[in-house]
């Protein structure tokens, strides 16, 4: 369709092979049943239809010519067999319930370029909702290649409209769904082409929504083992060349700044920081991380993000992660220089001075370098500018130059060769002098002239030898001097490496501190003292009581001493800092602003109408529950406003014992070691028009042949066809006929050309177009006919989706049992996160429910908050265990696309408008037909539009009810969160019950084997499937199990394996957890909280241990690290 090559030829050959199979098999089995079908075509029509079939099947040119020589009977048999095959396949597809269920169907539509927007949109939904076997089948049929072709084709369009951008956006989501499959990840990792195509969409000419999706996906791709990071940097370098950037990352930074005044601001910044953290913090090499970080800071990244703290929890997580990793790298650099504090310029200067005293040869070079640095600093107002970045990169290249040692070795070998050559020349020179002396003596003794015979090289004058020797000596001196210079440079590099690295880190740190003081300084309190800025995890303890509410922010303080280094000192009223701001007005303290850095002081109210949350704080450090806070400005209109704090006081002790952080010093978890088309119509020897007189052909040969093939479906004359179109005669035209005719409506240019010629000399295609040109508003008539034929089918297809959306929304909003569970989870999470920035929140987003299964007990990784919750509900609220039975429509609702529904309804309204206009302008039979239909269609379209608006309003109301963002939420995502929790809840219950049954069976076997009398059930030794009321659901004295009875047998301690939960599938819920996992969805979800980047913080943990596994084992190891991350 878009590209031609060997793959397309192979597909044609494959199609040709399939034709051969059809012929060879069905000649034997199917011919008998088809022979009774009478051939009712003329030889010309048979030839045209057979030629059309060969084109549709993609038969190669050479084979096509051969097959066109077949007998008419053989051609007819193949046509009949093909029609039977088509009907059989259609029946099979109808029995399955939909024609849109197979990857082959989507690929055929993509290659035919038929309604590309709707096809891409439907494919996106199918890939997101089907099992991974469906995705693998799509990839196996070269579906990923087709998507990339479409993506690049629309990307290369010089002028793009909103539809083009929408197709690109859907393609990004399709690529993300494909990456959930192992085969999809392999397809992406084979080349950097996918990375380059995606990154090119970060240009500011693309909509922010599309760039945001690309940022999220690219950030996840960066963490792909072995090649992800290098491919992303390669793509960004390609983007730099394409956009003519001075430095890389420049346009990406500018893109983040450009959304500052949009509703997408904080979500876009979160995705942007996700990419920055993935690029900067995942490499294993410290110098690489420092260099990449300096590139971003040189482009004023810190200034960009410092103003955005305290608004979005996800964004705060990414910003804090950036500074945490920077602090870690600073500590690591400091550990490399134990003899000197690399962060102290004075100590570094003293150390350098000592080195200079012991190495006088370095003094001149060092002074020259320092002079240059001083000049650069004094002439540049921007100390984080590009010149410093270039200098830092140059020093890094010198330090990493692998050719330095080889150059020294080469110079040494060359020096040795010169010495050897010099010795040989000296020896030859001495021998030649002796020969000259002997020759002179012989000449003196006799007057006989004897020739001078030299068996070696010709003799040279002594003066020439001396000149050569001097040149060699000079060469050797220059060589020695060069070698000394190399040694001096090497010593200089070693001495200055620590200095330059330390200075770079110092500048970065000072910039961060300066901005933290000047931009994010909190307002002064009522005593006139200023609260210290909170930057990183190294903030002061939160144990002190909170200060009184601060007054409105004062103007930024100017002047004073240098910015304080982190961590900031406590507030002080002593001298040194600038004078405090004016005291607040007497009108009473206004509500305080959000604390900087996302750190929330315990007890501080968030908005004026909300009282402060006072959750209990655990007495020990707990494993945090990763959840997302609902913004306080939407609390009042959501369910969270009426949620009460559930009393879990009697459960605190058990929760602390199960979910407290282990006391031994935690080590960084390491990942386990493991294995890492359209077929062009025309050309060739296609069918030829058989006419008795010379004909005039004014059409393109390909268009002419395509018209001939299309006309083979009509068995009426052109005038009759024209009359059928004019009168909208359904007895002679059907829906497919109208669609075909609409494609060949003559253009105005073609009509003008036809008017200049004699109609009696027209060929068949020209005659056809000439007849169509006589019909007034032929395009409008055909479109009205198509709309009339499709209306009922479209409404039948839309109604189930609209009903599912409406019903799913009402179920989710009105499920009281689900509401009570959310109330319990809120209180549970606030206790677990007590005393941390994640505690004391009013509500959480629904996708946070998946964190219940991820939060494990450090003492026993088999125990999760989900299992604890179910045990607790069994004991206290058993009726809530059946909350999922009230959800009957969400599994259907999560497959609904509002965008598709809106597009289909808009299409119906457009068709209705066209129909109404045509009724006013048409005459005769067509007016009568359309007039009778317009009333019915108006009622039907109005009704379906009303139903859609009702369902949409219900969905938006439900989304708002749970504190979610109406503008960004979609049924695919919103209902997926609820459905996922429902299914995980059911599977966990089934797993617990199965475990109890196993314990019962084991106890029964032991009881039968025992020789003594049986113990009565009243003693409490029997095992109950449901605990009695008042029995604690958790027995904390056992570290290896979850208590499932009042007194379990001492010899067996049952446990619940999370792996078993994830592998067991029941009923219709299998599609929620595909067989091979959801790698990319899980990776992108973990990246939001920083877990994925922390898990891959040192890429060597899961990449360099694979021993050439090609990255597959590395992906498994990364996936395992994400699942086991606590």
Swiss-Prot record:
GO CC list: actin cytoskeleton; macropinocytic cup; phagocytic cup base
Consequences of knocking out this gene: No visible phenotype. ForA and forB double null cells also show no phenotype.
Coiled-coil portions: 463-514, 980-1010
Compositionally biased residues, Pro residues: 543-597
PROSITE patterns: DAD, FH2, GBD_FH3
Superkingdom classification of source: Eukaryota
Subunit annotation: Interacts (via GBD/FH3 domain) with activated Rho-GTPases. Interacts with pfyA and pfyB.
Limits of the GBD/FH3 domain: 38-406
Domain FH1 stretches: 527-611
GO biological process: 'de novo' actin filament nucleation; actin filament polymerization; cortical actin cytoskeleton organization; phagocytosis, engulfment
Organism lineage string: Eukaryota, Amoebozoa, Evosea, Eumycetozoa, Dictyostelia
Keywords of the record: Actin-binding, Coiled coil
DAD domain: residues covered: 1071-1100
Name this protein carries in UniProt: Formin-B
Residue segments, region Disordered: 1-21, 427-462, 518-619, 1004-1078
Gene it is expressed from: forB
Taxonomic source organism: Dictyostelium discoideum
Short name of one Pfam family: Drf_FH3
